[in-house]
Each structure stands twice: as C-alpha cells, then as structure tokens.
Amino acid sequence: MMPASNPKKNSSERRIVFHVDMDSFFASVEVRERPELKNLPVIVGSDPKGGSGRGVVSTCSYEARKYGIHSAMPISQAYRFCPDAVFLPVNMKLYAGVSAGVMEILRGFAEKFQQVSVDEAYLIPGSGVRNFEEAALYALRIKDEVQRQQKITCSVGVGPNKLVSKIASGFQKPDGLTVVRPEDVRDFLFPLPVSRIPGVGEKTEETLKKMGINRVEELANCDVQMLSEKLGKMGFRLKQLANGLDFEELVEKESVKSISRHGTFAEDTDDPVKVSGSLDLLIESVHGSLMKHSFLFKTITLTVRFEDFSTYTRSRTLSIWTSDVFVIKRTAMQLLSEFTGRRKFRLVGVGVTKLRERDERQTLITDFP
C-alpha cells in the first residue's frame, strides 16, 4: 500500500468524482424521436435483411436485451433472437447533436470535466459539494436536468476516483444512481468479477482465471510479483485498481492527433461476415468521434492481427480532407481485401490521422445529398 504521505493519494481521497453514462444512448434517442417505439425492442445497427444481413448491433434498448441481444452481436443473430424487433440504421448526425446538448448540460455542473465518448463523461463538482451526501443530491439534479432538457435518462456513479465512479454508474442501469464513499470502496469492489476492472479483457481474464483469480478481492490480495510475471507492468496496475487506487486526473481537452478503434474477437475467426461487420461498427465509432470534434481527416489506417499474433497495418492517404463515413468504409474494406482468405483474424482496427478542425464556413462535396 502506498504511504499515507503520498500527495496523490491524499488528493484522490478528497475528490468526489462523477461518471455520467447515458442509458442505451442511440436507442434512447430513437425512442425520443419516435415515442411509439417506447417499451418495444429497438435495435440500432445494420439492416438485418431477413436474418441474412451483414454487420453488427451498435446498441439496443433494454427491452431488446431481454432477448439476449447486446452490442457487437451479429445483426443476423439479433434477428433470429427477436425477428419482431424494430431495426433502425445508425444516425450518427442525430446522436452527435443530442450528445452535444447533454455534454453542455454536464459542463454546467462541473468544475472539471472530461468527455470520454459520445455518451459518457466524468466531472468533478465545485466546492459547494462538500461530502458524498451532498454529492448524491447533486447527482439527482444532474439526472433531472438531462431528463428535462433532452428527454432521455442517464445513470450516474459517484466515488472517490474515476475507477470507482465508472464501475458504479453501471450498477443500477437504467436511470440509476450509485454512490460509493471512500470507506466503502473495498466492500463495493471485492465481490465483483475481475472482468469489471477496466483493462481486464477476455484474454487477461482468462490468464487470471488460470491463476485462480476470479473476483476482485482475489486480484487485490494476489502477490504483485506473480502478477507481474504473468501480465508485465499491467499486473501492478491491475492490483492497484483492484484495491480501489486510481490517481488518474480528469483531462479537460487533449490535442487529438488521431482517432482509432480496435476490437478483439471472442474467438479467432475467418468468417468474412463477422470481420466486416465488426469493422463496420468500429468505423461508425471513429466517425462519431470525428463528428464530435468537428474534424476532417486525410489518412485511413487498417490494422489486423491474426491467430498467430502477427500484426499488419495498411494506410491510404487521400488527396483531400473529408469527414465522409463512406470514404472510411470503402477504403478500409479495400485495405481489408488484401488479408481475407489467409488466416483467422484475432483483431481488426481502423483509424484516421492527419486531422484538422473543420471550418464550418466550408461546404464539402459530401454535405450535399
């Protein structure tokens, strides 16, 4: 354990950090726009085409989740699970506009603010919130204001650091509020599966299970040298997190040089539908970030990793700057074609670089229908 005199620890213990996470964001926005969809299973993603469509689920309503449907599921499988669901295409322009409105509300409640995606953000309130009792009331005000102005719900986690507040926000979804005081952090974290710790993906979870580590408490109490031997530097970091120690500060704005997303398949696959569908979802996420930041790009990069862990990247630079999602899709699929039919894929990723802020006075060719 770090010494009590460590200034970072003292700062972390004094902090009250909020994590605000919109509930089933894309689907909730669609229901807001079309109230007749309320209480129906709504799935946002690719066209299912009678169960033979390509692509994956972007998000779905909580009613759809009752059928076992979840994000990143192949859209054809979602159709088989619930053929009567309402399937809608991704409308990133609509979601980006709502996101901007939500984030503006949250900034009004924050002394420090960090948006981390189109539908979630961290904030630290001002000095008027002096303890966790006041923080709970403050969180209710945030939730009420988002509901009043945007007509959608969010879940809020409150804790002494980013780690705890992030996990807490997912505890009572949808429309939830979970407050974890510093003295309750271990009681809150220890019963959880290790997969709830950020950074513990499927492969890391598998490694930990082979070590006999299934719950956060077991990770917290594991010998750090043993963890380091199995996981390298990440082992020490995971032990810290399992003990509720997170000294990461909120970063209000960083200079963005690139935007990328990657995803690892649950099982290595050579199924072109799964590969292209997952890539399509990653592209939509990249494009959402582009729109959020009002960026144009000039270079598209594809990353693939095969079952033997060999990794390759391919890039293509355009002659003009653009923000067109179809340019990303067309280029990425062309780059992907070089690798299809070789081996099983373990990971795919896509990114854009050579970014610049869009001048709103400009009119791009892609702005016209």
Curated annotation (Swiss-Prot):
Cellular component, GO annotation: cytoplasm
InterPro entries, alphabetized: DNA/RNA_pol_sf (IPR043502), DNA_pol_Y-fam_lit_finger_sf (IPR036775), DNA_pol_Y-fam_little_finger (IPR017961), DNA_polymerase-Y (IPR050116), DNApol_IV (IPR022880), PolY_HhH_motif (IPR024728), Rev_trsase/Diguanyl_cyclase (IPR043128), UmuC (IPR001126)
Superkingdom classification of source: Archaea
Site feature Substrate discrimination, where: 26
One GO-annotated biological process of the protein: error-prone translesion synthesis
Domain UmuC span(s) in chain numbering: 17-201
Cofactor: Mg(2+)
Keywords assigned: Cytoplasm, DNA damage, DNA repair, DNA replication, DNA-binding, DNA-directed DNA polymerase, Magnesium, Metal-binding, Mutator protein, Nucleotidyltransferase, Transferase
Catalytic activity: DNA(n) + a 2'-deoxyribonucleoside 5'-triphosphate = DNA(n+1) + diphosphate
Cellular location(s): Cytoplasm
One example GO MF annotation: damaged DNA binding
Active site: 120
Cofactor binding notes: Binds 2 magnesium ions per subunit.
Cited Gene3D superfamilies: 3.30.70.270, 3.40.1170.60, 5' to 3' exonuclease, C-terminal subdomain (1.10.150.20), DNA polymerase, Y-family, little finger domain (3.30.1490.100)
Pfam families, alphabetized: IMS (PF00817), IMS_C (PF11799), IMS_HHH (PF11798)
Protein residues bound to Mg(2+): 21, 119
Broad class of enzyme this protein falls into: transferase
EC number(s) on file: 2.7.7.7
Family of this protein: Belongs to the DNA polymerase type-Y family.
Subunit organization: Monomer.
Function: Poorly processive, error-prone DNA polymerase involved in untargeted mutagenesis. Copies undamaged DNA at stalled replication forks, which arise in vivo from mismatched or misaligned primer ends. These misaligned primers can be extended by PolIV. Exhibits no 3'-5' exonuclease (proofreading) activity. May be involved in translesional synthesis.
NCBIfam families reported for this sequence: PRK02406.1
PANTHER family: DNA POLYMERASE KAPPA (PTHR11076:SF33), DNA REPAIR POLYMERASE UMUC / TRANSFERASE FAMILY MEMBER (PTHR11076)
UniProt-recorded name of the protein: DNA polymerase IV 2
Organism: Methanosarcina mazei (strain ATCC BAA-159 / DSM 3647 / Goe1 / Go1 / JCM 11833 / OCM 88) (Methanosarcina frisia)
Gene it is expressed from: dbh2
